């Protein structure tokens, strides 16, 4: 078998030292050998940047939500919904409503416990403000707030806030309705205490946000993308109701009504098997399902 020919620049007798570029052959430096991505200047202590708070999120959003394209845009919705799902898994929420509104707003409402509003004992600001403006501030790092959780584990809400042109949170708990608004992660003002809750009012949290068109490539939510995701969530969390409503004026159905889907699967994965089976004949009509809980 013949041996492959060696490139002209490399011969059998070359040693590693022979392959090194001789700087004397380039008295003006190695500019001719530099890649197109090369930069001018030194790399020393002065080039190290420290980004404070949510500035890092706005500077490199892809590190937190994957991209600034369609996938990252919808990931913001998932992060807010994941917080509500965590409330459901903790046993305090059974309904999540997701609404797509005009002007590229999205609203997520649950009937959970509501984000705490009292002053944080260490940071000395309302806890809801802390959760929405500080990375890694949340109830999922221990201390009994949650046994299990999803999403970015305390990062999600603050990341969405940082990437939103406008972000509004409303909390119903401790006997009152509370409200605070933000712009690109910065509070527009202090947490407001509004009207007292009535005997028929439910507790919970509502988040309404408008993604920044200066950060995302496009800020139009796709209904079908969200529908597919929330159907899967409902299958995985039996008994949890997720309602998706598209209230955008240009997305109404033939009768002019908002497009609407209601996902509720009381048998969870068993219902998922039925969904996959559809109208096809099945060999075994009884779906085998096993479940266990760790202490």
Region annotations inferred by a language model:
Residues 2-47, 103-127, 138-266, 271-272:
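GHKL-type ATPase core
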Residues 53-54:
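Alpha-helix capping/hinge segments and adjacent helical runs
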Residues 59-77:
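Conserved short strand/loop->alpha-helix "switch" segment adjacent to the catalytic nucleotide/phosphoryl-transfer site
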Residues 71-94, 156-163:
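Conserved ATP-binding N-box helix of the HATPase_c
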Residues 94-100:
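A conserved short beta-strand within the histidine kinase catalytic ATPase domain
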Residues 131:
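Short basic (Lys/Arg) and small-residue
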Residues 223, 231-235, 277-280, 287-289:
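Duplex nucleic acid-engaging cores and interfaces of nucleic-acid transaction enzymes
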């Amino acid at each position: 078998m013949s041996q492959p020919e060696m490139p002209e620049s490399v011969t059998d007798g070359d040693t590693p030292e022979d392959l090194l570029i001789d700087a004397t052959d380039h008295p003006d430096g190695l500019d001719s050998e530099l890649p197109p991505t090369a930069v001018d200047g030194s790399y020393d202590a002065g080039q190290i940047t420290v980004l404070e708070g949510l500035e890092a999120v706005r500077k490199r959003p892809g590190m937190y939500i994957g991209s600034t394209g369609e996938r990252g845009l919808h990931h913001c919705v998932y992060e807010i919904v994941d917080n509500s799902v965590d409330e459901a898994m903790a046993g305090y929420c059974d309904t999540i409503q997701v609404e797509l509104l005009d002007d590229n707003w999205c609203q997520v409402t649950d009937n959970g416990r509501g984000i705490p509003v009292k002053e944080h004992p260490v940071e000395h600001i309302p806890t809801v403000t802390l959760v929405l403006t500080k990375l890694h501030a949340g109830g999922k790092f221990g201390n009994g707030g949650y046994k299990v959780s999803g999403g970015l584990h305390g990062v999600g809400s603050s990341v969405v806030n940082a990437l939103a042109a406008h972000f509004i949170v409303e909390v119903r708990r401790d006997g009152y309705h509370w409200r605070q608004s933000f712009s690109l992660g910065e509070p527009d003002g202090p947490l407001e205490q509004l009207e007292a809750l009535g005997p028929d009012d439910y507790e919970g949290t509502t988040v309404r946000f408008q993604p920044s068109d200066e950060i995302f490539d496009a800020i139009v939510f796709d209904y079908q993308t969200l529908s597919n995701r929330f159907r899967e969530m409902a299958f995985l969390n039996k008994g949890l109701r997720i309602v998706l409503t598209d209230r955008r004026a240009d997305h109404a159905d033939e009768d002019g009504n908002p497009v609407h889907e209601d996902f509720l699967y009381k048998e969870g994965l068993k219902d998922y098997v039925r969904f996959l089976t559809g109208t096809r004949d099945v060999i075994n009509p009884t779906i085998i399902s096993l479940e266990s809980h760790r202490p």
